[in-house]
Amino acid sequence: MKRIAIVVCCCLTTTACVDRLEPPLPPSHRQIEQVQDWAHKRSGPYDIPETALRAYAYAAWAVAKQKNCNLGWPTLAALGESLSNHGRAHDSRLDNDGTTTVPLRGLNLFDPAHPQEVADTDAGYFDGDPTKDIPIGPLQIMPSRWEQFNAAVETDAKPNPDNINDASLTLAGFLCSVGDPGTPDGWANGVQQINANPEFVKHVHAIAKKYSR
């Protein structure tokens, strides 16, 4: 991945109101050297694969620069943990370029007893299931959403839903499209688009808050 400088200039605000969860954002930094160096230093303490952490940080930086969208990497990291354990579900891992070694399909790790039923939109083209849509990749993006928002970090490459770099950039773009994730309502609305269960939203918020410290 191209080495870049990343600036994170957001702070974390908390509230006692359960129904109004403040967006978890990283603490202020004047300058976070470069994504790779930054991720290398924090991968161990956060227990996030360095490749995944780099992907989350780059995606947050990219949407901030290109879309003026105040997402923050902790939200992407919290979703990555909740949806696939950062690409490590089902004995998978991320290879050197960020692609999972096992195709991750329909994981539903948060509530496996109640999988989402979604009508088919892609005839199995992305998810391999011609009967219904199932979420794909390390960030469990629905096929219809992937088709609309897919983005590749490398501009000359085809976006790959099984690659955490492309998946992070795609999910970041989607979250920015449904509201301002730098506000409580915008943040909650974005996460609800992934899983409308209020407990899931609170779960993601708690993890993102942990990463924000």
Language-model segment annotations:
Residues K2-R3, D180:
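Short, intrinsically disordered, charge-biased short linear motifs at domain edges
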Residues S43-R213:
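Catalytic glycan-binding domains that act on GlcNAc-containing polysaccharides
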Residues M1-K2, V204:
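Polar low-complexity intrinsically disordered regions
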Residues R3-A64:
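N-terminal export signals and maturation junctions of secreted/periplasmic proteins
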